[in-house]
A protein has these predicted regions:
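Conserved catalytic scaffold of divalent metal-dependent phosphoesterases
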Residues: 8-15, 82-173, 177
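Short, flexible loop segments at boundaries between secondary-structure elements
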Residues: 183-198, 215
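Core catalytic region of metal-dependent phosphoesterases/phosphodiesterases
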Residues: 14-113, 172-182, 206, 210-214
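Generic beta-sheet signal
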Residues: 77-79, 121, 159, 189, ...
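Short acidic-hydrophobic surface loop/beta-edge motif
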Residues: 107-114, 197-203, 223
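Active-site glycine-centered loops adjacent to acidic/histidine catalytic or metal-binding residues
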Residues: 7, 49-50, 79-80, 161, ...
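Short, solvent-exposed loop/turn segments at secondary-structure junctions
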Residues: 54-55, 165-168, 195
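Extreme N-terminal starter segment of soluble prokaryotic enzymes
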Residues: 1-3
Length: 224
């Protein structure tokens, strides 16, 4: 089975408690309890960003040990708060050094899971002129991921951290890529709390599902 949950905001190695935010009380234990109730060893869970508050890899170790201790394979994408994410090579070396064996990364690639192919990127949220470089980079990363998915075959399942549509904001560059590859559903995070009310569920024929942890009661969301 395939599940997803975004924005875990773990801080087991850092002093960044989430219980200062309404609704986030005891969130780590709630995630664990719900995960153990649903996810089996042969399942896969996609986590599209904001996994850990660690500022460097060494500050994420306890968070990754926590994740490693949960059943299933895990696929991570980068979020805006994942400042620990340096390069894929360095992160994979960190995993190897610390016996983190159930976690894979998506950045310019795609991963086949049964008859589904997981792809995506962080995305981008703003459209001001000074953000053009970053936005174009994220667009190309999404293109490369989707191209890799085509090579692997299977049904594409797309994850972004940032929603390409939110309130009155629309990232047309990202939407154009989704249209180009005939994507009809996107899973995303980033939005929290009352921001849920401005989340867009469908735009121009594409469905968007917000799966930030607090918006889905800290419970992995079942896809298929």
């Amino acid at each position: 089975m395939l599940y997803t949950i975004s924005d875990l905001h773990l801080s087991l190695s850092t002093d960044k408690p989430m219980n200062i935010f309404k609704g986030w009380e005891n969130h780590t234990q709630r995630i664990k309890s719900n995960w153990l109730r649903l996810v089996k060893d042969d399942d896969t869970v996609v986590l599209p960003g904001d996994f850990s508050w660690g500022l460097k890899l060494s500050e994420t170790l306890e968070d990754f040990k926590f994740l490693e201790g949960l059943p299933g394979k895990k696929i991570l994408l980068k979020g805006n708060h994942d400042l620990w994410w340096s390069t894929v090579k360095k992160v994979n070396e960190f995993f190897e050094q610390n016996n983190i064996t159930s976690v894979s990364l998506i950045l310019n690639n795609a991963i086949k899971v049964g008859d589904k192919t997981i792809c995506g990127t962080r995305g981008w949220f703003y459209d001001e002129s000074e953000d053009t470089k970053v936005r174009k980079r994220e667009v190309m990363r999404l293109v490369r991921s989707l191209e890799q998915a085509q090579i692997l075959g299977g049904e594409k399942v797309v994850f972004l951290h940032y929603p390409p549509v939110y309130g009155e904001y629309v990232c047309n560059d990202i939407l154009a890529v989704l249209k180009q590859f005939n994507i009809d559903t996107v899973y995303h995070g980033h939005i929290h709390g009352s921001g849920y009310n401005s989340a867009v569920s469908e735009y121009d024929g594409i469905k968007f599902k917000l799966i930030s942890a607090d918006c889905i009661d800290f419970t992995p969301f079942f896809i298929v």
